[in-house]
């Protein structure tokens, strides 16, 4: 709890919205402004050799300010933890949107791709190379503008942008040929290749170079040969050819990409890559409000803000600025005022009772991408699903940011160990400049925050308990043995253990040999992790604030791209159908109401994939759907697995 003392002075923590290999992302409320943020929480001991990667990401984000880059607000470091407070991106991963549409039209692709080019061109102008460009590292904000996240693998060459890098990193399916060969390379040229892969994925819905065998995939990338679908236009084919040149010297440069004919079609002007959010001029209204609040004169406050320490003052100023940009009053609240539905009381009670958050059972509430309506508080003792209520925070049509959400990212799938060896990084201050375009998606297909229910552990593949039948039962939670060498942060209990685990990532990291370098847990805590304990305490102490019952059946959600509609009208029938299919696909799961928390494991017990499937009632008469959400694991493996599961269901 001591590590959280400073953080809890300024933020109220809500549910977990993303998980990754070494981080967890929580939704939180900034107390003074009432603005929602995403807080990336990392344990230094768990990070091990990944610690330099986090330092790299922090330094990069302190120097980058752009309308298409996820904004860093605040950095807190304690003896054991690092907290990064980041912009809250409710729109979810670009990857999820692509697979929901199968592929994007050329016009839609152009809108999206211009934003990607804008962000990457700005990154390059500041002397950085991102080196991990992929759809999972691009999130949508509440206005459906793209935000680039995850700068843990970025590099800032020591000399200039023409300095050749040596480190082999990134995801194989998006990595440039010169990078995977181990040659020295220019970061900007490698990024252009990755952007070419992105462009192909946007217009085609699948990877240009793909194979289950890593060596076969390596050879395909080195040959540079890929299928050209018949629906691609001649101009888009030409651009792909120019970006996916195996020889980096023949590859199109970023300068020429900005005003490429395909890029400019329907726009008639080049991509505006300059920053529209420079730090050069402070906003008068925000400075005045902070001066009044802190009882300082304007000049003193301007001087303090201009230090850009990324402390609470920086966070408050930037969040006030964000409020103003959305047309909200530039006003700070009393520090004693509680945000949203969750109060600071739980944390006070913890201290007064000498509880340790390590000793509280986790609520396991993971934020679901694409949430429009969601319930902030849930009842863990309920066996049904709560009917969500509309929240004032309708921002996130998903993610995390990535967590690692991605997302912050929602959700955050990262490649460990060797990706971090960024010897090329050096610190230099950033300059400012300006850019951008807006994009409204068609009516999405949607999920909602998942509610908490008592775990119903399945002990045989054929005995399932639907929430409606379980209402009058006393459920006995059966402990499940977990492999000793399993390394997941959240150990998933399961009763249906498959003899065969076959999920392997296509996008294996280039330094896969080092994947086990991250220190293993010395032993699972009896009642769950510290962060998960926060969820539980908030749940227990705010239960009275619930609206509606958790026993009313599946939640009613708005249509969203993360929801698959079915022909069935009975939610219990659909739930049983899914549960009968999962063991056949070698997927272990835990049932909580109408939500199934699923995972796959390797032959050695290592968790390779975590995702959720929730049966929901759409806001139309007699329409039942399945909400899908990836929590951890390779995005393309997840896509294939979930498609296989859903196609096998008789729905």
From Swiss-Prot:
Changing residue 286 to A: Abolishes dependence to reducing agents. Autophosphorylated: autophosphorylation of the T-loop at Thr-167 and Ser-171 is required for activation. Thr-478 phosphorylation during mitosis promotes interaction with PPP1R8. Monomer. Interacts with ZNF622 and PPP1R8. Activated by autophosphorylation of the T-loop at Thr-167 and Ser-171: in contrast to other members of the SNF1 subfamily, phosphorylation at Thr-167 is not mediated by STK11/LKB1 but via autophosphorylation instead. Inhibited by calcium-binding. Kinase activity is also regulated by reducing agents: dithiothreitol (DTT) or reduced glutathione are required for kinase activity in vitro; such dependence is however not due to the presence of disulfide bonds. Changing residue 339 to A: Abolishes dependence to reducing agents. It is an enzyme of class 2 (transferase). Expressed in placenta, kidney, thymus, testis, ovary and intestine. The modification Phosphotyrosine is found at residues 163, 367. Serine/threonine-protein kinase involved in various processes such as cell cycle regulation, self-renewal of stem cells, apoptosis and splicing regulation. Has a broad substrate specificity; phosphorylates BCL2L14, CDC25B, MAP3K5/ASK1 and ZNF622. Acts as an activator of apoptosis by phosphorylating and activating MAP3K5/ASK1. Acts as a regulator of cell cycle, notably by mediating phosphorylation of CDC25B, promoting localization of CDC25B to the centrosome and the spindle poles during mitosis. Plays a key role in cell proliferation and carcinogenesis. Residues 326-651 are annotated as: Autoinhibitory region. Potential therapeutic target for treatment of somatic tumors, such as brain and breast cancers, down-regulation of MELK inhibiting tumorigenesis. Induction: Up-regulated in many cancers cells. Up-regulated upon treatment with radiation or 5-fluorouracil (5-FU) in colorectal cancer cells, suggesting that it might be associated with increased resistance of colorectal cells against radiation and 5-FU. Down-regulated upon siomycin A, a thiazole antibiotic, treatment, leading to inhibit tumor growth in vivo. Changing residue 168 to A: Abolishes dependence to reducing agents. ATP binds at residues 17-25, 40. It comes from Homo sapiens. Residues 282-321 are annotated as: UBA-like. Belongs to the protein kinase superfamily. CAMK Ser/Thr protein kinase family. SNF1 subfamily. Disulfide bonds: none annotated. PROSITE patterns: KA1 (PS50032), PROTEIN_KINASE_ATP (PS00107), PROTEIN_KINASE_DOM (PS50011), PROTEIN_KINASE_ST (PS00108). Residues 602-651 form the KA1 domain. Transmembrane segments: none annotated. The KA1 domain mediates binding to phospholipids and targeting to membranes. GO terms for biological process: apoptotic process; cell population proliferation; G2/M transition of mitotic cell cycle; hemopoiesis; intrinsic apoptotic signaling pathway in response to oxidative stress; neural precursor cell proliferation; positive regulation of apoptotic process; protein autophosphorylation. Residues 11-263 form the Protein kinase domain. This is Maternal embryonic leucine zipper kinase. Changing residue 460 to M: In an ovarian mucinous carcinoma sample; somatic mutation. Keywords: Apoptosis, ATP-binding, Calcium, Cell cycle, Cell membrane, Kinase, Lipid-binding, Membrane, Nucleotide-binding, Phosphoprotein, Serine/threonine-protein kinase, Transferase. The gene is MELK.
């Amino acid at each position: 709890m001591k590590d959280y003392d400073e953080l809890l002075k300024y933020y109220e923590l809500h549910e977990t919205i993303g998980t990754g290999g070494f981080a967890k992302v929580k939704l939180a409320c900034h107390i003074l402004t009432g603005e929602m943020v995403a807080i990336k929480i990392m344990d230094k001991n768990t990070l091990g050799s990944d610690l330099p990667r986090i330092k790299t990401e922090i330094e990069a984000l302190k120097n980058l300010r752009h309308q298409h880059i996820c904004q860093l607000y605040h950095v807190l470091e304690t003896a054991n933890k690092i907290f990064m407070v980041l912009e809250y991106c409710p729109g979810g991963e670009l990857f999820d949107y692509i697979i929901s549409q199968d592929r994007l039209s050329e016009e839609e692709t152009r809108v999206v791709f211009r934003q990607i080019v804008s962000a990457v061109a700005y990154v390059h102008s500041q002397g950085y190379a991102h080196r991990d460009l992929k759809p999972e590292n691009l999130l949508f904000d509440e206005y459906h503008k793209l935000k680039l996240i995850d700068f843990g693998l970025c590099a800032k060459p020591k000399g200039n942008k023409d300095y050749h890098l040596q480190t082999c990193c990134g995801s194989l399916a998006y990595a440039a040929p010169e990078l995977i060969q181990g040659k020295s390379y220019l970061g900007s040229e490698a990024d252009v290749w990755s952007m070419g892969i992105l462009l192909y994925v946007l217009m085609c819905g699948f990877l240009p170079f793909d194979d289950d065998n890593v060596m076969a995939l390596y050879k395909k990338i080195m040959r540079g040969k890929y299928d050209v679908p018949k629906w691609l236009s001649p101009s888009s084919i030409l651009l792909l050819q120019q970006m996916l040149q195996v020889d980096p010297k023949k590859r199109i440069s970023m300068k020429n990409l900005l005003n490429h004919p395909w890029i400019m079609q329907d726009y008639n002007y080049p991509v505006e890559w300059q920053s529209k959010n420079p730090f050069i001029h402070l906003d008068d209204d925000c400075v005045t409000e902070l001066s009044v609040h802190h009882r300082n004169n304007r000049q003193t406050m301007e001087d303090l803000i201009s230090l850009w320490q990324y402390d609470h003052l920086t966070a408050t100023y930037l969040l006030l600025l964000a409020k103003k940009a959305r047309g909200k009053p530039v006003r700070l609240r009393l520090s004693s005022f509680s945000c949203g539905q969750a109060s600071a009381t739980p944390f006070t009670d913890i201290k007064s009772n000498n509880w340790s958050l390590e000793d509280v059972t986790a609520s396991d509430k993971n934020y679901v991408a694409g949430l429009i309506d969601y319930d902030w508080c849930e009842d863990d003792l309920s066996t049904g699903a709560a009917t969500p209520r509309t929240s004032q925070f309708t921002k996130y049509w998903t993610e995390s940011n990535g967590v690692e959400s991605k997302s912050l990212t929602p959700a955050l799938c990262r490649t460990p160990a060797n990706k971090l060896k960024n010897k090329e990084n050096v610190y230099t201050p950033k300059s400012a400049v300006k850019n951008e375009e807006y994009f409204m998606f068609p009516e999405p297909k949607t999920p909602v925050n998942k509610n908490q229910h008592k775990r119903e552990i399945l002990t045989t593949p054929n005995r399932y308990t639907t929430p409606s039948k379980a209402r009058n039962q006393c459920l006995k939670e059966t402990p499940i043995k977990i492999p000793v060498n399993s390394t997941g942060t959240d150990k998933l209990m399961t009763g249906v253990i498959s003899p065969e685990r076959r999920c392997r990532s296509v996008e294996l990291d280039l330094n896969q040999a080092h994947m086990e370098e991250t220190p293993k847990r010395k032993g699972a805590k009896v009642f769950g992790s510290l962060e998960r304990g926060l969820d539980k305490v908030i749940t227990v102490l705010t239960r009275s604030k619930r609206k509606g019952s958790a026993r009313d059946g599946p939640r009613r959600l708005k249509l969203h791209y993360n929801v698959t509609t079915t022909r069935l009208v009975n939610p219990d029938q659909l739930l049983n159908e899914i549960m009968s299919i999962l063991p056949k696909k070698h997927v272990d799961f835990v049932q909580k109401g109408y939500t199934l928390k699923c995972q796959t494991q390797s032959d050695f017990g290592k968790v390779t994939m975590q995702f959720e499937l929730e049966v929901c009632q759409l806001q139309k008469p007699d329409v039942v759907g399945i909400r899908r959400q990836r929590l951890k694991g390779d995005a393309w493996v997840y896509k294939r697995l979930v498609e296989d599961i859903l196609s096998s269901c008789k729905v």
